[in-house]
């Protein structure tokens, strides 16, 4: 079976071809269009892999994408209903990036763009979405482990922001997850923006900035995220508005009352900003350690696979290695929730 994994609505767009379970090609669009972390539809990648008219797509049995848009619509609807009337702001295009607006109608958009290459009469292979965090968990398949615990943490997927999986042999299985609003990744991103940097991009700068701060805000930052039993946690939404306004107004007045006004982009970095960065990093590491300690107590296994955007946080990875004392695998490309991850999960499901 030949499976084509395709990413077209988020950063790091590209494709992967899996043939009888073996990767034959993994190609990110940025290698061709020279735009780092590009969100462009991978037109050049498709042409490179299948020819100018896409004729080679006839040899593909299944196309898969790392977003289950039906599941995302359901969970988006729940968030919308829970936050009425203010959550109606989430229906405004400006409350999300253009790419996130596209995800909810991904299959239709994908078919239309592929037919611009192949022509309208071309019969495309069926398009099968897989869960976003499932695709992240596919990092296990490129690990050297026969079994492992798998932690997926990012901004949000189609139904979760944190997911715990068990990996064994050629299968991964989700054990539990946290919903899309209780998102450590979104907290990190919106505090990054508060500190005057670009969200969904400059989180690494804030991680580095944390080394220059002190612990004066750590205790207050723990008020934002509560640790619960069984390795779970909850974000105190009295500090955050992203469940009602998205990116338009992600922080509440309560947040500003505690931490002060936001730093404008390019503004002077005050000691207060450094302390907020320190607190953000310290609490992030603490939450991840809380989750991992519980997941390993529930399923003892010395091997851990870490995937999703949080896997890009060096401080988190270092803290995990110091705490666990065992192997912590971070894939060479933690954004494996892309084309290859989707194709690997589709193979596990038999392409169905």
List the predicted regions and their residue ranges.
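Short acidic/glycine-rich loops and adjacent helix/strand connectors
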Residues: 1-352
């Amino acid at each position: 079976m030949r499976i084509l994994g395709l990413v077209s609505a988020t950063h790091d767009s590209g494709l992967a071809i899996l043939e009888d379970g073996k990767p034959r090609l993994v190609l990110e669009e940025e290698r061709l269009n020279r735009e780092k972390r590009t969100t462009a539809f991978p037109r050049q990648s498709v042409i490179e892999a299948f020819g100018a008219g896409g004729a080679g797509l006839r040899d593909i049995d299944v196309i898969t994408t790392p977003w289950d848009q039906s599941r995302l619509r359901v969970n988006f609807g729940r968030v919308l209903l829970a936050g009425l009337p203010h959550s109606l702001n989430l229906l405004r295009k400006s409350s999300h990036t253009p790419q996130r607006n596209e995800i909810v109608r991904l299959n239709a958009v994908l078919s239309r763009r592929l037919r611009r290459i192949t022509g309208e009469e071309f019969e495309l292979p069926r398009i099968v979405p897989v869960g976003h965090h499932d695709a992240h968990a596919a990092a296990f398949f490129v690990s050297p482990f026969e079994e492992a615990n798998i932690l997926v943490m990012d901004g949000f997927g189609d139904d979760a922001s944190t997911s715990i999986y068990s990996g064994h042999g050629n299968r991964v299985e989700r054990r539990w997850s946290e919903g899309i609003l209780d998102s450590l990744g979104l907290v990190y991103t919106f505090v990054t923006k508060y500190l005057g940097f670009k969200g969904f991009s400059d989180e690494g700068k804030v991680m580095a900035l944390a080394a220059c701060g002190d612990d004066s805000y750590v205790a207050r930052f723990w008020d934002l995220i509560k640790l619960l039993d069984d390795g779970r946690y909850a974000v105190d939404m009295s500090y955050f508005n992203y469940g009602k306004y998205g990116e338009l107004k992600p922080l509440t007045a309560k947040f500003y009352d505690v931490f002060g006004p936001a730093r404008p982009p390019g503004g002077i970095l005050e000691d207060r900003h450094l302390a907020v960065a320190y607190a953000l990093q310290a609490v992030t590491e603490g939450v991840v350690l809380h989750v991992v300690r519980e997941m390993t107590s529930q399923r003892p296994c010395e091997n851990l696979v870490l995937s999703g955007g949080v896997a890009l946080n060096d401080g988190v990875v270092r803290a995990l290695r110091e705490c666990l004392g065992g192997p912590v695998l971070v894939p060479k490309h933690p954004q494996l929730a892309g084309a290859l991850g989707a194709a690997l999960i589709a193979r596990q499901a038999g392409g169905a």
